[in-house]
Structures are given as C-alpha cells and as structure tokens.
UniProtKB/Swiss-Prot annotation:
Part of the 30S ribosomal subunit. Contacts proteins S5 and S12. One of its GO terms (cellular component) is ribosome. GO terms for molecular function: rRNA binding; structural constituent of ribosome. One of the primary rRNA binding proteins, it binds directly to 16S rRNA central domain where it helps coordinate assembly of the platform of the 30S subunit. It holds the Pfam family Ribosomal_S8. This is Small ribosomal subunit protein uS8. GO terms for biological process: translation. It comes from the Bacteria. Belongs to the universal ribosomal protein uS8 family. Keywords: Ribonucleoprotein, Ribosomal protein, RNA-binding, rRNA-binding. It comes from Clostridium perfringens (strain 13 / Type A). NCBIfam families: PRK00136.1 (NF001109).
Amino acid sequence: MVMTDPIADLLTRVRNANSVRHEVVEVPSSSVKKAIVNILLQEGYLKGVEEYNDGVVPMMRLTLKYGANNERVITGLKRISKPGLRVYCKKDEVPRVLNGLGIALISTSKGLVVDREARKLGLGGEVICYVW
C-alpha cells in the first residue's frame, strides 16, 4: 500500500501509542523520519530509539517517555505542512509553540531544525510539525 504522508503516519503512531500509554511503538524507517526521531530524542520527548531490519522494510522501535506518575511527556503532536497544503515560514516568522514550551520542527536548507535553532541561525523553511 502506498503511503501519501509518511511523516503524518509517524506522528499518528506515536500519538496513538502515547494516548494508551504503550511503552514501545514501531514505525517504518526513512531518512526524514530518522531526523524527526533524533530531534525528539534530543529534546527529551523520547526515551530511546532502536533501528532494525525486519527483512523487507527497515524499522525503528521508539521507546516513549513518561513522567514519575506515568504522566505523558508528549502532550500533543500536530502535523502542519501537509502534501496538499505546504506551509512555509520566513526567518522573521518562525512560529513559537505554546510560547516556547513546545517545539516546531522546520525543514531548512541546513536540514531539519527546531524553531529555536532556526531563529538563532536566521533560517526559514517548511514547518513540518508542532510537538508539545
């Protein structure tokens, strides 16, 4: 089956696993998904990532992170730029998620970066998603 938006599929799998408090979620791997997952890991939204090859499709096993009383670290995930409606921002219009409590992932000429880094580097680009 052909997937029209693999990034939305990744975000939906993480959102669904998080909502039912699963410890682990498995997603098909790609270079863009690896970049997104690495940023989520660096920002403290995921506990761990393991890559493996399941024969046909390379996969990633994501370990979700929860707080002390089993509260969710990821409160929300929202896909912004979609295949049918791309959303771009200029360097002066980089979005701020929940007044800095969340992050916006932006695809720039320097690769995938977080909104803080895009502001610091003076870069605009395609707004991939919000995480809070």
